[in-house]
Amino acid sequence: MNEDVGDGWATSAAAWIAEQGEDGDYGRRFVLDTPMRARIEGRGFRNALDVGCGEGRFCRIMQRAGIRTTGIDPTEALLARARELDPDGDYRLGRAETMDFGASHDLVVSYLSLIDMPDLGAAIAGMVRALRPGGTLLIANMTSFNTAGPPEGWTRDHDGTPRFTIDHYMEERATWVSWRDMRILNWHRPLSTYMTLLLDHGLQLRLFSEPQPTGGTPEQIARHRRVPYFHIMEWQKPD
């Protein structure tokens, strides 16, 4: 049973699974996966918690890197797919806001899941609790100027030139976004909200990057360079 059916994920799960496949969508395949892999491989991480693991794709990537991984997600249909693809994996129904793993993980990952969490403060607190002292919190997130775009986002001006509209940037809000038979409730928050919550837990910022595309069509690459979708942050919990 889903922990929360009001965010669109339960009804969008089948379309999401079909779009992701094994390689992921454009953003994962051509923008995020390479730098995210670089942050987990060869660093001696023994165990990891993937918060908002969805269909388990990044859990499988971490396991192939030799990291024992637990994935949690509030959508049962996504977990069912994760277990189907990885029968020996550890996938659990749960939310970041209410999980309680104790300080037991070398690595906690949020791969494009913070925008789905209604109580960001509780979610980040849960992630920090799950880290052992000295552990790493690795976050891939949508940029806040991008999430400030909907409902207008990409439009065309009077001469047909594509423009991206940003508005109400400082106003935290939930917005329904729809694409390819999916309709999901996403949260916009200014970057300062994320940074303040993470800093208030005493975490130390070790990396902030805005990765560029490594492939895709010329149109996809050009659009991403004009209005980047993603950033990556790595934080360390003090010893």
Model-derived features with residue positions:
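Conserved class I S-adenosyl-L-methionine
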Residues: 1-43, 57, 78-81, 138-172
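A short glycine-rich, Lys/Arg-flanked "PGG" loop and its adjoining helix->strand segment in the class I
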Residues: 121-136
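Short alpha-helix
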Residues: 185-208
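Core SAM-dependent methyltransferase catalytic element
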Residues: 201, 221-239
